[in-house]
């Protein structure tokens, strides 16, 4: 871990203060007439993959602040209330280089000095995609861990070659201590190899994961492809979007690491088995409507509902979907366990095969990031498009809403 010293000087030199730059516009409105009821005191924090930067912009596309990370972004950014920013960056010589790989986490202070930097990348694992900063000061993130062909076979994997199963890691970034960990391979069921302990009927085990659901369509080892996580600290639950399963999984975070490797313990009594799952009941041979086809950003709303971006919902057309989630969660074999869809938005012009997400704004509107096109949408509850803005950034991971009363703005000198 690096803390201040030379590293902070280099970061300070490579980062550019937005308030010292000329007010550049970074895109244009697609239709100026579609700006009727937007809150003009709202700003947008854009994770710009195409330029490996982050930008704070307004509705007119004026850039108020810019972070140039002197490295490749990979993928998420978090702006904290004190003006500091946490960013995921790509590690050199990462063991797994699938889309969204990272391996480095950096916290940059409001004055652009480096607070800390940690690496979670080795010949056997690589952090990727997403990170959250918890109220206890820890970070929680996604990571691939490599299993050899022999190790995969021992778990009943029907394919051949290396596989990259998913883990979730909570780390103290100041000490680099791993304080909690969850591993999907502890929660597998498979009906391929009856000599293995995890052999069973997939449909009878809705809280476990069918290891072989994607093997026939994936030859690169990336079987699951987690790409987003959200932590509900009040209820100690983790929500993850599982792209290649077209699902959202819900995992108990109240467990110890030992309990997380089992099927007992924790507030919800399931250990690390899935507390809930939805979006594609075909993954566990169950009944119910399939509502997701590739999915990004599990965004928990204040109401307890969840917003997601369904990338491939229609033929070359995406959809944003809001699910009503009602606890206590229950997964019953042979029963429709899918939640109710309470809101959705789609448009024939909106399509991104990857990346992307949606945020519910204070005025009730929804901000949508069409990631692979670099386009931002603001839509009302009834589907009216209030703002449609094509940025100059060709690839956006996500866009976060920042309000004018956010103390981060003052900390940044804005």
Specify the residue positions occupied by each region the protein language model found.
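Histidine-/acidic-rich catalytic cores in large beta-rich domains
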Residues: 23-414
């Amino acid at each position: 871990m690096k803390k201040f010293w030379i590293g902070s000087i280099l970061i300070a030199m490579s980062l550019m203060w937005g308030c010292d730059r000329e007010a550049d516009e970074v895109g244009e409105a697609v239709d100026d007439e579609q700006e009727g009821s937007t809150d003009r005191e709202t700003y947008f924090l854009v994770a710009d993959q195409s330029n490996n930067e982050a930008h704070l912009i307004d509705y007119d596309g004026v850039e108020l602040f810019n972070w140039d990370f002197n490295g490749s972004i990979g993928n998420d950014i978090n702006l904290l209330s004190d003006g500091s920013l946490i960013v995921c960056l790509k590690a050199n010589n990462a063991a797994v280089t699938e889309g969204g790989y990272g391996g480095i986490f950096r916290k940059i202070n409001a004055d652009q000095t480096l607070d800390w930097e940690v690496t979670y990348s080795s010949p056997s694992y690589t952090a990727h995609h997403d990170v959250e900063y918890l109220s206890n000061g820890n970070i929680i993130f996604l990571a691939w861990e490599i299993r050899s062909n022999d190790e995969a076979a021992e778990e009943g994997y029907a394919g051949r070659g290396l596989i990259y199963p998913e883990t979730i890691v909570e780390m103290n970034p100041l000490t680099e201590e791993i304080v909690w960990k969850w591993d999907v391979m502890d929660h597998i069921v498979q009906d391929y190899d009856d000599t293995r302990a995890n052999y069973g009927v997939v449909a009878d085990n809705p809280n476990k994961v069918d290891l072989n659901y994607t093997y026939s369509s994936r030859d690169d080892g990336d079987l699951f492809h987690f790409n987003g996580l959200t932590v509900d600290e009040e209820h100690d639950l983790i929500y993850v979007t599982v792209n290649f399963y077209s699902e959202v999984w819900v995992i108990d975070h109240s467990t110890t690491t030992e309990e997380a490797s089992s099927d007992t313990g924790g507030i919800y009594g399931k250990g690390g088995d899935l507390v809930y799952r939805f979006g594609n009941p075909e993954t566990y041979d169950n009944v119910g409507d399939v509502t997701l086809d590739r999915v990004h950003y599990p965004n928990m709303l204040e109401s307890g509902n969840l917003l997601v971006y369904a990338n491939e919902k229609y033929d070359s057309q995406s959809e944003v979907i809001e699910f009503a989630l009602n606890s206590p969660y229950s997964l019953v074999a042979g029963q429709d366990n899918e939640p109710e869809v309470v809101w959705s938005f789609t448009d024939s012009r909106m399509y991104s095969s990857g990346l992307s997400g949606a945020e519910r704004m204070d005025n009730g509107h929804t901000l949508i990031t069409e990631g692979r096109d670099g386009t931002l949408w603001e839509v009302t509850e009834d589907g009216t498009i209030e703002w449609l803005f094509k940025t100059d950034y060709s690839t956006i991971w996500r866009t976060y809403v920042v309000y004018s009363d956010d103390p981060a703005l003052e900390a940044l000198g804005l």
